[in-house]
Structures are given as structure tokens and as C-alpha cells.
Amino acid sequence: MESLTLQPIARVDGTINLPGSKSVSNRALLLAALAHGKTVLTNLLDSDDVRHMLNALTALGVSYTLSADRTRCEIIGNGGPLHAESARELFLGNAGTAMRPLAAALCLGSNDIVLTGEPRMKERPIGHLVDALRQGGAKITYLEQENYPPLRLQGGFTGGNVDVDGSVSSQFLTALLMTAPLAPEDTVIRIKGDLVSKPYIDITLNLMKTFGVEIENQHYQQFVVKGGQSYQSPGTYLVEGDASSASYFLAAAAIRGGTVKVTGIGRNSMQGDIRFADVLEKMGATICWGDDYISCTRGELNAIDMDMNHIPDAAMTIATAALFAKGTTTLRNIYNWRVKESDRLFAMATELRKVGAEVEEGHDFIRITPPEKLKFAEIATYNDHRMAMCFSLVALSDTPVTILDPKCTAKTFPDYFEQLARISQPG
């Protein structure tokens, strides 16, 4: 297996221009494909997950052109639901941001298509979304294991009253919200359980509004969506930088700055993961906010005990930053780490122990006590981009670290290690 050894980093300093947000890129691509008119997306993320969405749109007959660097995409909207005339099966890798929204969107009309993906995708639950779509009339068959992909979709979603469990993934609600305006009837979506990752729903609602559709949000408990609507192209749309990707550079600055500035997101960003900067500030770093940037300067870091439900992806970065904080850090209410690209609670606990930390892994929490000195280790990444990026921070000590399968960062940030090297000074 390929590996990358990072030598100790004495200091980080500089500016990082963030690649486009994965969450925003894939939502914007699908809405542009469903919309009337031509949409130009700029600062689109070029990554595996986005390529899976683009390949799916091609198979579904959507016409688009990409710039040479794949960050500018001109899409001719379909002016309504997508039709799987020639496509029989779509392979979506491990891209939840493609699988969940497409599973809903392709239940409109009378399609007959199979959605499948990598082995890990077949372990990521989708039952709550399928249950909700079936309540709205969709005909969906599990082809292997009940409640998991692959799925056969045969259209039939017309709207109506739909209950969806919000406790596992906000992507199920996102998928329903994006699809419901195109259904022939009105849809009332009721949330069962506590809604996780609420800020990701705000991204969805924000983008739908950009594409001309507004819905009634009743305190995140119920959403009322008028049927028979259509999305309208906003013309040109700039995809903001990826706030989850920003977390590694901001944390690096908190641990070994200097000052690092990330551009492409700022105080008005629609992504909830910008709140990661508040957590670093609480730990002792100095944060400065601009309209189009966030900067972080090193501080003496202290442990925290916090509910991380609002920033599940960026919270992983706090788990490795905790290695450099004084005291025991506890991250709570993060059960949904278990159903991401890997079982992130298990993976994080296992790899933190390798570098010498004392770790308690609970059903929905992790507690981390750093060692006096970090140990050299080979870090397994579980084909999970965030594991690779999180554990790169170990090199901000006097200890090198080896990352196995470093290219797994291609899911969201293909040149992550080059960008980290650019702001790093060797120890």
C-alpha cells in the first residue's frame, strides 16, 4: 500500500485558497441539472465525489462543459425531473452527497434505474430515506441488504405527508427537500427524532432559494413544500470554499502557528462548519473573521468538553488537535460519525491510541487524553479522506507520522498534502 511519511513541522504560516465545498458543489450540480436555463458554476470542487455526480448526470443525459481544471462547469438544465432512458445503473463510489439526493430525484416520474457504489457505500444506511420516499408513492427495491444500497428505483413519488427520521443523517432530509418541489402534489415532511447536522439543511435551503424555490420551514420540525414548482437557473453561481477542508489548516495554526489564513469562506458563509473556528477559539487560539477569509493564530490550547452535533465533519479535526491540548477533551453527540465514509468513532479511537493517547470510545462520544510525547505510528486511513487529513496534524509535534493510502484525500481535496507542505516549515 502506498504511504506518505510527514517529517516534524516546526511552524505553519501562510494563506490557503480553499477548494470549493463538496456539500455545495454536488447540491448545486443537481439543482442546475433540474433547473430551467443554463447555469455556470465557478470554484466547483474537483474531487472523486463531484466526479461521481458529474458521471451520473452524463448518464442521465444532462449536457455540460467543464473547464480544463474542472472548476468551472456550464450546465444546460433539464427543466424538470431527470430521466434514466439509456442509463440502467449508476455507480456512485462512496459519495453520499450523490447517492442520497439522486435516490430521491430519480423517484420522480417513471424511471427504472439501479444506484450502486463501493463496498463501503453498501454499509451506509439509506433505509430512513427509502421509507420516506415510499410514503410519497415511490417504488424502491433493495437489491442486496435491507436498508442499504444498491437500490432499484422505479419512480412514483408524488408528494403527500412524509415522515423522515432525522437522527442519522441530514442528507435524507436534504434529498427529500430538493426533490419535493418537482412532485405533482404538495409535500409535508415531518421530522422524527432529533435532526442532526442542522447547518447542512441550511445549505440545502439556501441553494434551493438561489434556484428560485422557497419552502416553509416550521422550526426544523416540519417542512411544507408546494408541488408542481420548477427550479430556475441563477445564471452564474460561485461555490464557496470548503469549510470542512479549512479546519485542518486552522487547527495547524492553532497548534504550530504563525498565522494561517484560509480564503473562500468567511463570516457570512452558509456552511455550518465555519463554527469550527469558534471551537479553536474556545481552546485558546486567536481567530480573525473577514467577509472572505478566516485566520487563526497559535494559542496555548486547553481541552474542551462539547456537543459537536452541529459540526460533525470538522469535529474530527478537534479529535487530533486534542493531542496538543492541556487536559482531557470530550466530543459528544457524534453518533453519526459511525455511518460516514468509515466508522469514524472506531477509526479515530484506534488510530489515536497508536500515537499514545488514552482514549475512551462511547456509543456517541469520544474522550481523549494526550500523552506526554506522541509516538511514531503508521496511520490506517480506512479509505476515509478525513482520517488522512486529521492525522497529518500529528507531524506538528517532534514526531514524524506515516499516513497509509494518502491518495484517499481525492474524495474532497486531491492536493491536500501539497497545500499543507506549502505553509509548513520543517522541524
Swiss-Prot record:
Q: Where does 3-phosphoshikimate bind?
A: K22, S23, R27, S169, S170, Q171, S197, D313, N336, K340
Q: Where in the cell is it found?
A: Cytoplasm
Identify the EC number(s). Answer: 2.5.1.19
Annotated phosphoenolpyruvate binding sites: K22, G96, R124, Q171, R344, R386, K411
Q: Indicate the residues that form the catalytic site.
A: D313 (proton acceptor)
Q: Which UniProt keywords apply?
A: Amino-acid biosynthesis, Aromatic amino acid biosynthesis, Cytoplasm, Transferase
Gene3D superfamilies named in the record: Enolpyruvate transferase domain
The record lists the catalysed reaction(s) as:
3-phosphoshikimate + phosphoenolpyruvate = 5-O-(1-carboxyvinyl)-3-phosphoshikimate + phosphate
Q: Which family does it belong to?
A: Belongs to the EPSP synthase family.
Q: How does it assemble?
A: Monomer.
Q: Tell me what this protein is called.
A: 3-phosphoshikimate 1-carboxyvinyltransferase
User: Which species expresses this protein natively?
Assistant: Escherichia coli O6:H1 (strain CFT073 / ATCC 700928 / UPEC)
